[in-house]
Amino acid sequence: MTAVLDSLGSDMHTNHITSSSFSTVHKSQDSPTLPVSTVTDSSFFSSSQTGHCAGTAYAQLASYSYHPGTVGNVHYSPKAYDLGYASSYGAYGTYGASSSPTPTEPEKEESEPEVRMVNGKPKKVRKPRTIYSSFQLAALQRRFQKTQYLALPERAELAASLGLTQTQVKIWFQNRRSKFKKLWKNGEIPADQQVASGDSPSSSPPPQAGWDFPPNPTQNDGDTVSEQPTGPPNTTAPSFLTNYSWYSSTNAVTHLQPSTLIQPHHSSAMSTGTIF
């Protein structure tokens, strides 16, 4: 019984190989590009490989269907599989390392300011204040007395001469101006600073009137004229002054006092004229 089954299986296998080789040769002869010898050789190798693959697939199917628990019957190369997996994983690892570099923490700390928690609230730490030397403070104070605002060239020149940055000079002038305004409102500025700064209206001298003359007029030759005792000044104002709105009778004495001082000058001139 077994001999009959073996003979039938071999006949079926031979018929399958023959039919496959015949179909391959027939199709290959129809192609105009390949010669006959090449077609025959290729059909032989393809037919043998096809038969081997078919037998292997049938054996795997049979072992899987009748013996599902025996996985050892399936032939595969675990070494090749492991090497392929390792090589692909290694390639992925190198790509990840080159494409995504890890950021450095010190750079973040340098760019971001330090933050401290004060009463449960974040607060940025201020930079330390600039400590000016006595020479720098004296030079800045002298320049502030001359002018309270500096142009860009002046600020750059002053900063270079004192060894400071322009920002430090700018901040010093801003703080000094605010302090000066606060003292000026409270009336605590000394007299020398008022005259030097020139901001207060009282520091500027009052404008001199056009008709005011010095108390001791001088002649052309440089000799002073001796004053003569005169009576009380005339408080009566001329008639043309009453036409102006700015004139008041209380100011008549102050405006007419210089005119009384001119009288000795004219009288002395007249007396000298009579001598000659």
Swiss-Prot record:
Known DNA-binding region: 125-184
InterPro entries: Distal-less_Homeobox_TF, Distal-less_N, HD, HD_metazoa, Homeobox_CS, Homeodomain-like_sf, HTH_motif
SUPFAM superfamilies noted in UniProt: Homeodomain-like (SSF46689)
Keyword DNA-binding appears in the UniProt entry: yes
Compositional bias annotation for Polar residues: 218-238
Protein name: Homeobox protein Dlx2b
Positions of region (Disordered): 97-123, 191-238
Family, similarity comment: Belongs to the distal-less homeobox family.
Pfam family, one: DLL_N
Primary location group: nucleus
UniProt subcellular location: Nucleus
UniProt KW DNA-binding keyword: yes
Alphabetic keyword roster: Developmental protein, DNA-binding, Homeobox, Nucleus
Gene transcribed to yield this protein: dlx2b
Single GO BP term: tissue development
A single MF term (Gene Ontology): RNA polymerase II cis-regulatory region sequence-specific DNA binding
GO CC annotation terms, alphabetical: nucleus
